Curated annotation (Swiss-Prot):
Pathway: Cofactor biosynthesis; 7,8-dihydroneopterin triphosphate biosynthesis; 7,8-dihydroneopterin triphosphate from GTP: step 1/1. Belongs to the GTP cyclohydrolase IV family. Its EC number is 3.5.4.16. Signal peptide: none annotated. GO terms for biological process: tetrahydrofolate biosynthetic process. The record marks 145 as: May be catalytically important. Converts GTP to 7,8-dihydroneopterin triphosphate. It holds the Pfam family GCHY-1. GO terms for molecular function: GTP cyclohydrolase I activity. Gene3D superfamilies: Urate Oxidase (3.10.270.10). This is GTP cyclohydrolase FolE2. It is an enzyme of class 3 (hydrolase).
């Protein structure tokens, strides 16, 4: 049977990345409270393609994922990338897992439990035997405007915001570490299940800790700078303003070295 993929390309130009996107599969991730958590991932996976090949072998990406049944961590991702690189005879391999991660949070007053969903991404790349990984998580929080509180006789405007954290790490860290870090940087965490006593607590607690997006991003960045396993981070806070027809945002990006580590 003719192998069209290996025939000469009409335009001899190398391709940086080619593969498959939005492939869904079950996934097991590490869970600080339960040990393991079963979720569903949407996966992008690809390799580079030399200029002389017309096309890649798309089925081999799916085969690699079908044969990969491990719990998601850096070591298992590296093995997957090595397998893809070998199957496709490529110099570079890439994989991105997007998945929801759930934490059962207790309401602050009544202790009523409710699952909160956090959107996560883990990207892995392998080139010349050297892997690199990028972990991203989105954390919803509540913010109360300090200016509105200061100038108003009654109340202040409040809204939901999202803290987006991206980190490169030297060693494994729990997702919960970054979720906790983001939640304490806002005016208040948000919850799925709140009774009246809980709503009272959350409202009063948030109004006691008013924050601009600038405050939230600085607080989160300061905590990330102190994290011993982080070599680089980016944090962005986006506030879905309740009294404006636009959103507010702030972002900070830093590379952490022994010289820039706080306390060094």
């Amino acid at each position: 049977m003719e192998d069209v993929q290996n025939s000469p390309a009409q335009v001899a130009m190398p391709i940086d990345r080619v593969g498959v996107k939005n492939l869904q599969l079950p996934l097991v991730v590490s869970d600080r409270a339960q040990g393991r958590q079963h979720t569903v991932a949407t996966v992008d996976i690809g390799v580079d393609l030399p200029a002389h090949f017309k096309g890649t072998h798309m089925s081999r990406f799916v085969e690699a994922l079908e044969n990969w049944t491990e719990e998601l961590d850096y070591a298992s991702m590296k093995r997957l990338l090595e397998d893809v690189k070998t199957r496709l005879e490529a110099r570079k391999a890439y994989v991105l897992f997007r998945f929801p991660y759930f934490i059962r949070k207790k309401a602050p007053a009544t202790g009523s439990p409710g699952l909160v969903c956090y959107q996560c991404r883990l990207t892995g790349e392998l080139e010349e035997g050297r892997p690199s990984f990028l972990l991203e998580v989105e954390v919803p929080v509540m913010t109360v405007c300090p200016c509105s509180k200061a100038i108003s006789d009654e109340g202040a405007h409040s809204q939901r915001a999202v803290v987006r954290i991206a980190v490169r790490m030297t060693r494994f860290s729990w997702l919960e570490e970054f979720i906790d870090l983001a939640e304490v940087s806002g005016s208040s965490p948000v919850y799925t299940l709140l009774k009246r006593e809980d709503e009272k607590y959350v409202t009063e607690d948030a109004f006691a800790h008013p924050t601009f997006v600038e405050d939230v991003v600085r607080a989160a960045a300061q905590r990330l700078e102190r994290h011993p396993q982080i070599s680089w981070f980016r944090v962005e806070v986006e506030s879905f303003e309740s009294i404006h027809c636009h959103n507010a945002f702030a972002s900070i990006e830093r590379t952490i070295t022994p010289e820039t580590q706080p306390g060094s």
